[in-house]
Amino acid sequence: MSGRHTGQQQTHTVEGTDPQLYVGIHEPAADAGLRPVLLIHGFSSSSKLNWEDTGWISALLEAGRRVITVDLPGHGRSGAPEDMDSYSPSRIRADLLQTAFDAGARPLQDGDPSSGLDVVGYSLGSRLAWEFGATQRELVHRLVLGGPNMADPLAEFDLVAAQRYLADGTRIEDESTERLLKMALLLPSNNIFALLSLVEAIKAEPYDPAEAVPHVPMLLVSGEKDERVESLPLLADLARSAGSMPEQLVLPGRNHTNAVTSRAFKQAAVRFLAGQEPA
């Protein structure tokens, strides 16, 4: 599928991959001549909810940045593959890489500010972005990670309890599982069984940020009231030990749900990706 509307957006699905990821290419009215920005949303969200409705796409377009958005498998307008492999984090990262190249991203070249790729992730998207940045050193220029964590909460998700709840309404004892499942059920665009497949695939590929650490400059952001805020200095230490230059930003009064809507977050990210000093 393809089309254009506000913000000069082109949309299509990724050809030749099972997930049929829904991709949006958003063109700025005045191009700043900088590398494109890939946005990766969180669990049970979508590019529209995570990035468009919250003003991220418009903020980046106003800064002259070309923006690439992707709906993860089973989310938003992407397909819901039946095979488990399509939901594995490693497969998703491979599909994101293909998406970036299809959108015109190319390896970093010294002295060429339009080469390479900047990546912004939120929640689950931060996990994917961290691993993507660690494995794609010739492509990724800078990272912005919102609501990141030292461990993936989905790894502790109680799949059996979730399946029982969906089958007959049996109460879920684990609070995190109950919260994540109910959040996923709120969005009609989500394929709940596809999302459970994603959880199962994530359990099969445990997240260990120390195993592969990005060497690029990164901005780590969390809401003050988000329990994941405690992960920021730990991730920063990992990044620093790998030779990165991490910066941290804590958003006063914000939690994991509403941090992504923060104007201060967007402004800091736009400046950071452009290599500018904090305002």
Residue ranges and their predicted role:
Residues 44-57:
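The serine-hydrolase catalytic nucleophile loop
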Residues 60-79:
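Conserved alpha/beta-hydrolase
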Residues 90-115:
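Conserved acidic catalytic loop of the alpha/beta-hydrolase fold
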Residues 127-135, 140-170:
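Flexible "cap/lid" loop of the alpha/beta hydrolase fold
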Residues 194-210, 225:
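Active-site nucleophile elbow and catalytic-triad environment of alpha/beta-hydrolase enzymes
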Residues 214, 220-222:
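Short beta-strand/loop motif that positions the catalytic acidic residue
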Residues 227-234:
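Conserved alpha/beta-hydrolase "acid-adjacent" motif
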Residues 254-264:
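Catalytic histidine-centered segment of alpha/beta-hydrolase-like enzymes
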